């Protein structure tokens, strides 16, 4: 069964491992599988920010890593950098900075971004050298693959796949629909 035609219960946010923004009481949970080097994910980042501003406390956003290493050679390392920032309580500022500078994701750039978001650089450097967060990134990828994710960005609203292959405007429509179903 394709991800286009089924409701996916495995998309529920996991408070222990996911990066979540928004009220726990939100009616809609929007989960994205994305990569920091993906050009369409950059566009989606702007669309998601608009959704978050528009829907406010009705929307809870979850970001999961899905770096496509074959196409985006720096995406996996950028995902590790985001996880390292998350370990220091700075995931979202790093997430936003990585999307802002998605064409510049080499190690030297990531170190600069780590400094910009206020990370302990000694800790960051050690964790990146040891690939402390690689397993978490790979777990996100495996979880996405289990759900049928093959490309990025991939979105789910309350467990239902949103096909954005014809445009990101479908995100807004899907969130509206999910809200109506909750009413």
Regions found by a protein language model. Give the residues of each.
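N-terminal targeting signals for export/organelle localization
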Residues: 1-12, 183
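C-terminal cap of thioredoxin/glutaredoxin-like
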Residues: 4, 32-34, 40-50, 112-183
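A short beta-strand-turn-helix
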Residues: 10-28
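Short, functionally important structural connectors and interaction interfaces within domains
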Residues: 12-13, 58, 97, 120, ...
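Short clusters of hydrophobic/aromatic residues that line enzyme substrate/ligand-binding pockets
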Residues: 20-21, 105, 128, 162
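Structural alpha/beta surface segment adjacent to cysteine/selenocysteine redox centers
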Residues: 26-115, 120, 125
């Amino acid at each position: 069964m394709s991800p286009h035609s089924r409701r996916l219960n495995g998309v529920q946010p996991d408070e222990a491992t996911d990066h979540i923004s928004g009220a726990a009481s939100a009616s809609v949970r929007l989960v994205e599988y994305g990569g920091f080097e993906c050009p369409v994910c950059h566009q989606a980042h702007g669309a998601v920010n608009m959704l978050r501003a528009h829907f406010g406390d009705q929307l809870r956003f979850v970001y999961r890593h899905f770096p496509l290493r074959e196409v985006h050679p720096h995406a996996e390392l950028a995902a590790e950098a985001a996880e390292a920032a998350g370990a220091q309580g700075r995931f979202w500022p790093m997430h936003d900075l990585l999307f802002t500078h998605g064409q510049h994701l080499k190690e030297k750039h990531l170190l600069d971004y780590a400094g910009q978001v206020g990370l302990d650089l000694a800790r960051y450097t050690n964790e990146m050298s040891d690939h402390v967060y690689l397993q978490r990134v790979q777990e996100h990828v495996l979880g996405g693959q289990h759900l049928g994710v093959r490309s990025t960005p991939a979105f789910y609203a309350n467990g239902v796949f949103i096909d954005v292959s014809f445009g990101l405007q479908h995100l807004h429509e899907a969130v509206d629909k999910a809200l109506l179903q909750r009413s």
